Amino acid sequence: QPAGNPDAVVLGLHSFGDFGAAFDAMGPYFADNGHLLVSYDQAGFGERTQQGQWAGEEQLVSEAVYQIEQLYERYQRPGFLVGESLGGAVAILAALQAPDKVAGIVLAGPAVREGIRLRYGWNAAIASAAFIAPGYQLTVDRQPDDPNLAAHSARRLAEDPRVIRNVRMDAYWGLIQLADSASDQAPSLQTPSLLLYGGKDNSVPEAGINHLRDHLADRGEYRFYPQGPHLLLQGPQWQTVADHILDWVARTSP
């Protein structure tokens, strides 16, 4: 919490499998720069895991809209959304639903899929698997010494029991559908945007990011981090990324 009235109000939206603590380091860093950053466990994650089941796009987006509306009521100004991976897709869809309450969105390795090779073929395969074996689990390998992540983030993602490490097939299909929705609706987005992407991102294909850049056009800025991982806000360069976000927020604030 910054001293006095914050210069900007920011809502953090975490990635798939993660929870609100994804912003525990960035929150104080923002506060030191006069900004309020708040986050929460999105439906189906953290303290709200629902045994790993997918909460659904409608609930995820409506909760983000509710949170930003509450911040608007309290601080009487539009807020910013900072979304990582899944959180980026949620940010796109929430901004479309409440454009007057959102001053801008920051999309860090957002879950988007437009233009990827064999997109609909993969969809058919994943949908079939989710229908046949919805509870089948995919294991996510998370190492406490992952060099692609900041030390505190690597430990949290590997050791905190609130992090999902075994992903249900139907939840994975839900994530794919959410990413498709964000991709399909992105051309309608008019909100100022900052798009961030890492050269070591093995989760979101570059084709999806390039199509999103085209849709954002002159309403969006883009930053590329050659050594950046998929989870840019958890990476070793997280403070550099945070500085770029702070600079953009300062220039974009109404």
What are these regions (language model features)?
Residues 27-51:
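Conserved alpha/beta-hydrolase
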Residues 75-85:
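Alpha/beta-hydrolase fold nucleophile elbow
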